[in-house]
């Protein structure tokens, strides 16, 4: 289950930094909004993105 409930009263900011405000998540998931640049296939399946760019450290 996705612990991020930004759509239920919080805001998910996934520009340069993946952060959510007024919600229970500390990392931004694809189900909130895309953290990684478009065209990053390994971030397209809902994993937690940790960073600004699409590289080996992007997803855990």
UniProtKB/Swiss-Prot annotation:
Region feature (Beta): 1-28
Residues reported in the UniProt entry to bind a divalent metal cation 7: 49, 54, 58-59
Residues the entry annotates as binding a divalent metal cation 1: 4, 6, 20, 23
Binding residues annotated for a divalent metal cation 4, in chain numbering: 32-33, 43, 47
Residues engaged in binding a divalent metal cation 5: 33, 35-36, 49
Alphabetic keyword roster: Metal-binding, Metal-thiolate cluster
Organism, scientific name: Perca fluviatilis (European perch)
Binding-site positions, a divalent metal cation 3: 14, 18, 23, 28
The keyword Manganese appears for this protein: no
Entry text on domains: Class I metallothioneins contain 2 metal-binding domains: four divalent ions are chelated within cluster A of the alpha domain and are coordinated via cysteinyl thiolate bridges to 11 cysteine ligands. Cluster B, the corresponding region within the beta domain, can ligate three divalent ions to 9 cysteines.
GO MF, one annotated term: metal ion binding
Listed PANTHER family: METALLOTHIONEIN, METALLOTHIONEIN-1X
Region of interest (Alpha), residue spans: 29-60
Listed name of the protein: Metallothionein
Binding-site residues for a divalent metal cation 2, renumbered to this chain: 6, 12, 14, 25
Known role: Metallothioneins have a high content of cysteine residues that bind various heavy metals.
Annotated SUPFAM superfamilies: Metallothionein (SSF57868)
Matching Pfam families: Metallothio (PF00131)
